[in-house]
Amino acid sequence: MDFSKDIILDNVSYTYAKKTPFEFKALNNTSLKFKKNKVTCVIGTTGSGKSTMIQLTNGLIITETGQTIVGDYAIPANIKKIKEVKRLRKEIGLVFQFPEYQLFQETIEKDIAFGPVNLGENKQEAYKKVPELLKLVQLPEDYVKRSPFELSGGQKRRVALAGIIAMDGNTLVLDEPTGGLDPKGEEDFINLFERLNKEYKKRIIMVTHNMDQVLRIADEVIVMHEGKVIDIGSPFEIFSNIELLTKIEIDPPKLYQLMYKLKNKGIDLLNKNIRTIEEFASELAKVLK
């Protein structure tokens, strides 16, 4: 069974608090694909269905219609029990918005090794990997015996992320992974996600409200609105579509905000696929010659 191929959500739906006065349709018969080895960012306003959608990917919740297909494994609608749930959750690691609240062991070593050991990995082998995982998330290797509760919020988040990476799955699903971090923490995490994708060939699925991060890291952007996918494209295709951004009430990245202002002054760089300040400076210099 191969979980590394495309993840397909086929005509999926999900309703919270069904048959109560608080009933809310979070997903409404929508479909999409997360491609192998790609970085996909999911954007949309609060309540658009982003977080619900990513929880379908590893069976945390089950669709009410259609099916979830992970590689060559299908999870039909309304199924009561997923047969391959342990392997599915090993291969697709879901990192919640504040993963540091998931820490519970008395040492960092035990916390990071908990997932692999729980899924059947030899305990000694799992513990042996911990120093290298700490190094990967930019924490000192000698932290292994420390309590996670002695760490700062940002450090706890690094430990929690190391615990997900320890399971060595092919996919990381990240729900607002840099929320609440300082600028250096944000930069470190985005650098790590880029490295995990490029060097370790991990598929990254990231829900975020930070459009600057989307512009930097995404191969593809999925736009959610009122429980449906309303657009899919490259960062260039999405952020150069001002009508779309207005509809979903999302401001473009700062670089695109600057380019929109320049367009109003008669300098149009929006037809260029610009992703960095260096590319922007180069294209602007050509226009001003």
Curated annotation (Swiss-Prot):
Superkingdom of this protein's organism: Bacteria
Gene Ontology cellular-component terms listed: ATP-binding cassette (ABC) transporter complex
Annotated compartments: Cell membrane
Protein keywords: ATP-binding, Cell membrane, Membrane, Nucleotide-binding, Translocase, Transport
Main location: membrane
Positions of ATP binding: G44, T45, T46, G47, S48, G49, K50, S51
Enzyme Commission identifier(s): 7.-.-.-
Gene3D superfamilies: P-loop containing nucleotide triphosphate hydrolases
An example molecular function term from Gene Ontology annotations: ATPase-coupled transmembrane transporter activity
Role this protein plays: ATP-binding (A) component of a common energy-coupling factor (ECF) ABC-transporter complex. Unlike classic ABC transporters this ECF transporter provides the energy necessary to transport a number of different substrates.
Family to which the UniProt record says this protein belongs: Belongs to the ABC transporter superfamily. Energy-coupling factor EcfA family.
The protein's name in its UniProt record: Energy-coupling factor transporter ATP-binding protein EcfA2
Organism (species): Mycoplasma capricolum subsp. capricolum (strain California kid / ATCC 27343 / NCTC 10154)
Gene for this chain: ecfA2
